[in-house]
Regions:
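N-terminal small-domain helix-loop-helix segment of the aminotransferase-like
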Residues: 29-128, 135
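PLP-dependent aminotransferase class I/II
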Residues: 73, 251-328, 332-335
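Short Gly/Ser/Thr- and Asp/Glu-enriched loop/turn motifs at secondary-structure junctions
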Residues: 58, 120, 335-341, 368-372
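Conserved PLP-binding catalytic core of the aspartate aminotransferase-like
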Residues: 316-317, 321, 325-360, 377
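Cationic, low-complexity basic patches in intrinsically disordered or flexible, solvent-exposed regions
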Residues: 3, 17-19
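Conserved core of the PLP fold type I
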Residues: 89-220, 231-249, 253
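PLP-dependent enzyme catalytic core of the Aspartate aminotransferase-like
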Residues: 10, 21-29, 352-360, 365-403
Length: 403
């Protein structure tokens, strides 16, 4: 039992019942809250692992998980609430298992964003792009199959592969965190992976891929090529989306999310665009009624109000570009960013800097290669707080020369 302050205390019932009698086996067993995970018969490959997740602290400035810092307007929140109230009257029935209305809206949005006509049958949706990517690995990965990613990469790729028993191979990016096209092509030709992960913009570096790089990989990859575009709406002018390659690429899957630019992280909706046959394949592993009626309804309202939901994207892009310039002026190594975050370094002791910022009430992320940190782009006031906290922290731990 947990007290209000989070300290464990034993209830009177537990004090009197340290052991419970198992009537089926005739043996005494420990009370259910008197065991740890080490006492459970979990799979051997899980015993040394920790659950994935970013640190969570209640601080004034949270710039660690790449959320949109701007809330939906009150009028939009009221519209969502009204829609959910109407939907609740039918909550006794299962939702549309294929989320056809939501997928049609997502297809319409992709056409608006990229200029490519996408049909609802070319879109699949899930509880965040994490679920969609997991489903893709369940279909195209698995025991005896392999995947390939460039590093540094989104840590969840390793999780998707681990939980689907897919072997993950990696190859390094360049010193400036760009994709090495020649190395990517030669590695694919040598390993013949079933799945290739590409990320544009890349997390944690923020760097985007040229369409020519994606096309080169599509030309040699024997299996599926996934382009993770979680941050696509933040790309700079002239950076094209991989969605534009879909009409001529049967084995290309482009994943996106409403969690970032759409300021809908709490709604947990992600999606992918691909050939209709790929959608049919994903349906083979989806759980029944995986998207609740409330999720579908709220996300549909968000998409119907896309102009308002995306209204601060240009503001965040401008703040990002100012942050990149400011950090470079201080002497940091900062890759170009097409996302709503910036990676910067290098520090002899990045954890010390991270800790100093946290003491100042600013939470960022220890992400990327050793010596680097990542900051999400917040409001103007939040970024002012970040700059002040970083300058203060640098007095005690200056950056390491990149030479």
């Amino acid at each position: 039992v947990q007290s209000e302050k989070g300290r464990s205390r034993r209830s009177p019932w537990n004090a009197q019942h340290q052991l419970a009698f198992n009537t089926r086996s005739g043996r005494m067993q420990q009370a259910w809250d008197d065991i740890s995970i080490a006492d459970l018969p979990i799979r051997e490959d899980l015993k040394s692992l920790r659950a994935y997740g970013a640190p969570q602290f209640d601080v004034p400035v949270r710039l660690n998980v790449n959320e949109n810092p701007y809330r939906p307007s009150q009028s939009l929140a009221d519209r969502i609430a009204q829609t959910l109230s109407e939907v609740a009257m039918h909550a006794n029935r299962y939702p549309d298992r294929d989320a056809t209305g939501l997928r049609a809206r997502l297809a319409d949005y992709l056409a608006h964003d990229t200029g490519v006509i996408v049909d609802a049958g070319n879109v699949w949706a899930g509880n965040g792009s994490n679920e969609v990517l997991q489903q893709i690995l369940q279909v195209f990965g698995g025991p005896g199959r392999t995947a390939l990613a460039s590093t540094p990469a989104y840590p969840m790729y390793d999780e998707y592969c681990r939980t689907t028993f897919t072997r993950l191979h990696t190859f390094p990016r360049t010193e400036t965190f760009e994709l090495d096209r020649d190395l990517a092509v030669s590695t694919i030709q040598a390993l013949q992976p079933d799945v290739v992960f590409l990320t544009s913009p890349n997390n944690p570096t923020g760097t985007a891929l040229a369409l020519s790089d994606i096309q080169a990989i599509l030309g040699v990859a024997p299996g599926m090529v996934i382009v993770d575009e979680a941050y696509a709406e933040f790309r700079r002018h002239g950076v094209a989306s991989a969605v534009t390659l879909l009409p001529g690429s049967q084995r290309l899957i482009v994943t996106r999310t409403l969690s970032k630019a759409f300021k809908f992280a709490g709604g947990r909706v992600g999606y992918c665009a691909c050939a209709a046959a790929v959608v049919d394949a994903i349906k083979l592993v989806r759980l029944p009624y995986h998207l609740s009626v409330f999720t579908q309804a709220a996300a549909s309202v968000a998409l119907d109000c896309r102009d308002e939901m995306l209204s601060q994207v240009e503001l965040l892009k401008a703040e990002r570009d100012r942050t990149v310039s400011w950090l470079r002026d201080l002497g940091f190594d900062v890759p170009d960013s097409d996302a709503n975050f910036v990676m910067f370094g290098r520090f002899e002791d990045r954890h010390r800097i991270w800790t100093e910022l946290l003491r100042s009430g600013v939470l960022i992320r220890e992400a990327g290669p050793q010596g680097y940190l990542r900051v999400s782009i917040g409001t103007a006031d939040e970024m002012t707080a970040f700059r002040g906290a970083l300058l203060s922290a640098m007095d005690t731990c200056p950056p390491r020369s990149s030479s």
